[in-house]
Amino acid sequence: MSEVLDDKPEVLVQKLDALPTDPGVYKFLDDEESVLYVGKAKNLRNRVRTYFQQSRQRDGRIEVMVQKAVDVDIIVTDTEAEALILENNQIKELQPRYNVNLRDDKTYPYICIKNERFPRVFKTRTVKQDGSEYFGPYADVSKMNSMMDAIRSVFQLRTCSLDLTEEKIEAGKYDVCLQHHIDNCKAPCVGKQSEADYMETIEQVKKLLNGQTQELMDLLKDEMQRQSDAHNFEEAARLRDQVKALKDYSQQQKVVSQDFADRDVFALHVERDEDIGCGVLFQVREGKMIGKRHKFLRSVEERSDAELILSLVENYYAEANFYPEEVLLSHDPNDHPAQDTHALEELLRQEQGHQVPIKVPQRGEKASLVRMATSNAKLQVGEWKTQQMKRERNRIPESIKALGEALNMEAPPRRVDGIDVSHHGGKETVASCVVFTDATPRKSDYRTYKIRSTEEGTPDDYKAMREVVRRRYRRMVEEDGPWPDLVVIDGGKGQLSSAVEMLKEVGAFDRFPVIGLAKRLEEVYRPGDSDPVFLAKDSPALQLLQKVRDEAHRFAVTYQRKRRKKKTLQSELLDIHGIGPKTAKKLLGEFGSAAKVKEADEEALAEVVGPAKAETITDYYDETEAPAPAETE
């Protein structure tokens, strides 16, 4: 561990030595005190110290995080389950860069049981930390509306926002409203219903929201029988109607499990090439599917499926208000060497009062459920990609669309390479390749090439074009991209033919279209066409081609001039006896120019090239500046 900590501040090393062995949450900080990563641990000392062990294998994301970390903060908790919940809250609040990015469901609606006397039950899209209970979120709004309809038809609950304090009710501040007269509310506002009786109804609502429909129907049937035995036939009839409404609601739900168990089914589908994943949850209550929800996951390229599924499940149960008898997963979280399910198991055990099995089924009805959830996750990713493609298409500039249409291309050329050759009378021949994405220069992908195949002093644009095209696209073939959608050659038929020859030779000709743009009349040449294409001078397509061509020309000329200037500077230093190309390059790298070398004192020169060569340089400039001897008559 010491080797990893060599470059770390002493305060971090001391903290690692003093970490407690309790469960808790740890936060790694960078040199600006920004939180890089939040994690939980059963044993803080052991867990945090593993990040700095030389032998520990880490993915690239965590490796970078550890390199940036200069401090660690900890929060000790009583149990590992508490650490899990705290970790979840900290990640949501701080959004650390190196944690798994779970996109939030804040836009989906919830059903809220308000934290107040005689609680209201209503739909909301805003979750407040006010002690209220929230059920959801509901990705399918129609299912939520069906649930609310069932609640209204089964239970007599208030819908008003009156402040029903005991004092105001006893003071008679309120009058009954229409909802009481049509038997939708028992009028707690005027004391016709006690708080205890109302809260008993709320407990029944919670059972319905948690999918415990059969249990609730059994309770209502027992109560109906008691009321009937007591000759309270009106109340018994009301309870009978409640049971019927619940039965009608229950029959709308699909049976997906013949053992009628309560279980949650989590599945994951990830497409790392697109850096997108989706987790799906099926909520199965009494064997019936009562809800489905999903979360998209970003920044998944370097995260294992085991890590992602555990983050998904822990994130969910840290905020859940119902815990099932069994949890089914599409991937095993324990496959990741640096994590386990201990905290999750402890949390579920605390909430349920007994061990909750966490399984990855391989066959049978449960495996079928997991496969169905996985198919839904894959479908969600497909829908996301479709929407992403639509958004991408909407962002394509008009000039790109116009160019694709002008060249009869199947799709707009969103990535365009522009190639040009430059020389000075056949000397210092160079080439450039510029890249445009969506009509915008992508300068990080620009490249320059020193041409080696031409004879110094003999101009040969065709040979130079063949060399640059061969070098650039042979490498693309070897690395399989990134491929352009179009290549623009600065020149006419000759330059285009040279480029096509090399593209065929390296096996890249069929990968993308290539055209030549001649300067004289701005004609567009295509391989195999005897006549050029003329685009309207004011067309966005031609203007984009000119922009690419001119940028390639500018970049090539700039590089060629830079090389000439460097050679000119070096040639002055090479006139000094004993100074060769390597020494001249070293001097220019240190001082920037021959003039600066000339101005430097011998001591400064000696630090770069040694005292002997420093003396040679200063002697040379002293001699060249010495005044000519006076003429004698």
Swiss-Prot record:
Where does it live in the cell?
A: Cytoplasm
Q: Where is the GIY-YIG domain?
A: 21-100
SMART domains listed in its UniProt record:
GIYc
The residues covered by the UVR domain are 214-249
Q: Which InterPro entries match?
A: GIY-YIG_endonuc, GIY-YIG_endonuc_sf, GIY-YIG_UvrC_Cho, RuvA_2-like, UVR_dom, UVR_dom_sf, UvrABC_protein_C, UvrC
Which is one GO molecular function term here?
A: DNA binding
The record's Gene3D superfamilies line, in alphabetical order, gives: 5' to 3' exonuclease, C-terminal subdomain, GIY-YIG endonuclease, UVR domain, UvrC, RNAse H endonuclease domain
What keywords were assigned to this record?
A: Cytoplasm, DNA damage, DNA excision, DNA repair, Excision nuclease, SOS response
Annotated GO biological processes are:
nucleotide-excision repair; SOS response
Q: What is its main location?
A: cytoplasm
> One Gene Ontology cellular component annotation?
cytoplasm
Q: What family does the entry list?
A: Belongs to the UvrC family.
Question: What's the stated role of this polypeptide?
Answer: The UvrABC repair system catalyzes the recognition and processing of DNA lesions. UvrC both incises the 5' and 3' sides of the lesion. The N-terminal half is responsible for the 3' incision and the C-terminal half is responsible for the 5' incision.
Q: What is this protein called?
A: UvrABC system protein C
Organism of derivation: Salinibacter ruber (strain DSM 13855 / M31)
Native organism taxonomy:
Bacteria, Pseudomonadati, Rhodothermota, Rhodothermia, Rhodothermales
The gene that this protein is the product of is uvrC
